[in-house]
């Protein structure tokens, strides 16, 4: 079974990752940058989610919009993945959350 690897080469992620890796980054900034990375990665990871057309009444006219066909389940791998959970819930507020624990 071949595993697909998708490399996200984004300047905003690289910028934040540099601060996350810096030993002198204060805790509050570390958490802020980790959330920023999580938001950008979630946007990329959800790019291919299936959607369907829906009719929407705007203040001026009726038009077609797109909605997610179904909500995905967000599953962070404990403990490192918890840093990305807040960003995932911001983008997918109705998603169920599960957890996976892995021991080294």
Please give the residue ranges for each predicted region.
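PRPP-associated nucleotide enzymes
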Residues: 1-104
């Amino acid at each position: 079974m071949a595993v697909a690897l998708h490399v996200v080469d984004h300047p905003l992620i690289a910028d934040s990752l540099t601060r996350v890796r810096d030993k002198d980054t204060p805790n509050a900034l570390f958490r802020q940058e980790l959330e920023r990375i999580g938001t950008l990665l979630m946007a990329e990871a959800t790019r291919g989610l299936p959607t369907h057309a829906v009719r929407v009444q705007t203040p001026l006219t009726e038009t077609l919009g797109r909605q997610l066909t179904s909500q995905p389940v967000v599953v962070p791998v404990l403990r490192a993945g918890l840093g990305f959970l807040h960003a995932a819930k911001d983008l997918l507020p109705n998603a169920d959350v599960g957890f996976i624990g892995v021991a080294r």
